[in-house]
Amino acid sequence: LALSSSASDVYKRQLQAGIEVMRRLTPGKVHLSVRAKAEGQMPMLKGAELHTFAGKHPAGNVGIQIHHIDPVNKGEVVWTVNIQDLAIIGRLFNEGRVDMTKIIAVAGSEIEKPQYCRVVAGARVDSILRGNVKPQKEGDHVRIISGNVLTGTKTPADGFLGFYANQLTVIPEGDKYELLGWAMPRFNKFSVSRSYFSWLCPKKAYDLDTNMNGGERPFVVTGLYEQYLPMDIYPMYLLKACLAGDIDKMENLGIYEVVEEDFALCEFVDPSKIEIQQIIRDGINLMIKEA
């Protein structure tokens, strides 16, 4: 998102003030993570240790970044703040006023014109989408998501944008089913395996809906999770420890280093169709309760 020179300078001052506030709130280091080759004015900010990350999702997840910068151990506390929220904090101390304005992405296959919008945190969804959702055929529906498709929350059209959401997504509702769909070649269905012939077109774009294409299945070892979780842990064993409620094993397998969003991509590709993010959250909650 391009900013004018004057707006960029103002934003830089807000970020610098936010970093100064963070330094006063912690005896530890303040780390600033940005996308490689798109640092902009970030290297000019003082008081924070700069880190760059490149690659596909989940490279941008804060949990992944913490894992590679300074892994969390038992007894340690790490606080994180989004870059736009850092600017809001800086704006508060620079100007003495609470201004919750931020920029969000409005995206998804059912959006007429994908764009960035300047909104106030918690804005009404219909005020953001107004006239920007593609017309639907009779019987078709859309799902509105506060956040992204992997970790966001379903919200009605008259609902509100989540406080922490920086994206509003609209995709087709998967409420249509196929008879014996599993037996069809399905050239237009996405799959990470070679279950469908769509693997012959690796660069093809898909309009994915919310259909899970099946129900929950036995939790089997596939080796898929390790391909989609760039962390030095054993995700399958950690999940099983969470299911068993074995806190000692959870600690040894890295429960302190993860949050549920780190496993979102694993949940998407999981052939067992298990709610992996919920398993991780339940494990974390159990650990906190028993601490």
Which residues fall in each region the model found?
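Single conserved hydrophobic/aromatic residue that forms the stacking wall/gate
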Residues: A2-A7, Y11
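Hydrophobic alpha-helical positions that pack around
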Residues: L25-E138, V142-A183, K189-V192, Y196-S198
